[in-house]
Amino acid sequence: MNTLENTIGNTPLVKLQRMGPDNGSEIWVKLEGNNPAGSVKDRAALSMIVQAEKRGEIKPGDVLIEATSGNTGIALAMIAALKGYRMKLLMPDNMSQERRAAMRAYGAELILVTKEQGMEGARDLALEMAERGEGKLLDQFNNPDNPYAHYTTTGPEIWQQTDGCITHFVSSMGTTGTITGVSRFLREQVKAVTIVGLQPEEGSSIPGIRRWPAEYMPGIFNAQLVDQVLDLHQREAENTMRELAVREGIFCGVSSGGAVAGAIRVAQANPGAVVVAIICDRGDRYLSTGVFGEESYSQGAGI
């Protein structure tokens, strides 16, 4: 039977035509905005709920709790609506209005913490709520069902779509579920693939990408699965995001711009490489933030 959850995954992989170095390298991007709730997080959201159901930990009608910066919350709200769960989502109040509206549209209850509390504060409050018995904490940051989704779907799709020719995989790091799961799969293949993670520079803020304090580093992260970590400035991520729209026709979010900025760096340093990056979501979730505003384009940013 073809249900909404069956439409998650098997997203297109397309080659950039006008961006990237002229050194024989190729940059391919996986368009995760094509998932039904609009982001790569659809995969992890489905996995966390389905696997918990299989273990008998949750059943329709239960309350689920999660801390999110946006995309995971939207994806979980969609799956919760589909399967009959009540969803409580905790998020910093500086996240975009589009993301808040999407979560509420799916029927989720949204609980905001301050910008100063940030994702760390949202995670702490989600844990407190679960400990008080207010619902089941899915805990994407420490839940192995998160990277398992990418080990069983995203990684195999990339390998198949590149005919095994991929040489480098580049991914932004938030929960680290995508990079952990994809890397684990690629490590098991017959050829070496270099895994590159991306994080914000010290003092820089990029939605969807985190530079975690040691005490908040996601428990699912395995540093041995990442060969290199690149630091990105917010300006570089935003400029690349705008350039993707103007030059490649790919309308995406800031973290995706960061991923492609990192992929371009990797391609420049490795002539002949086949580099794959993740386009995490769509740009329409960021319109209210002003990153696509006329001022940015009038200043030549990203064009």
Give the ranges of each region predicted by the language model.
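PLP-dependent amino-acid enzyme catalytic core
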Residues: 1-303
